[in-house]
Amino acid sequence: AMLAPEPVISYPPELPVSAARDEIARAIRDHQVVIVAGATGSGKTTQLPKILLELGRGVRGRIGHTQPRRLAARTVAERIAEEIGSPLGETVGWKVRFTDEVGDKTLVKLMTDGVLLAEVQRDRMLRQYDTIIIDEAHERSLNIDFLLGYLARLLPRRPDLKLVITSATIDVDRIAKHFSGHSQHQDGHSGGDDGDGAQVPVVEVSGRTYPVEVRYRPVIDPDDPEADPDRDQT
């Protein structure tokens, strides 16, 4: 087990996800796979790792937390570290291509989905982790689709591994069906024909705290030397 100082955890009361934290924690405790659905701005990205830490996750293995973009991996790591009062790179670290700010004490590891995909090539069982969060699963990138498919097959072989998926509400049913029959209830029964064990709980977090404006970047020529490197998914 990795040793790290016990982080001090509190939840900003203005975030919609804070009101749902007991329901989320109960679902994670009782199920191997949980889906948290809600709009951008609900706080799920920053608060889920803290809920998991309170449940004792991240000790036998790290909490791996994927983001679709490199910039998000860093800024989310910074935010969580600030909220638990820990320097970045200690309890909370981040890893993207060419940058690795993860230490021996790291319990929560932010990364792009491309980084986790590369780690699958080297460690098929993902032994480094006791929990995986796939954030923004509705983005439906090739990386995310491959990871979800791979994890669905891995979970029966790693009954100790928990998977939390976040998504916009629109895509929840598709994702839940994808994992029905692949996960286990806390009592050890697998899904399939075993009734309730196959059901993946969906916790809906309603509302958003901050107004979110969606802006679309212009298409960038990949041969353009001035192209934005943040578009590289890994």
Summary of predicted features, one role per range:
Residues 1-234:
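P-loop NTPase motor module signature
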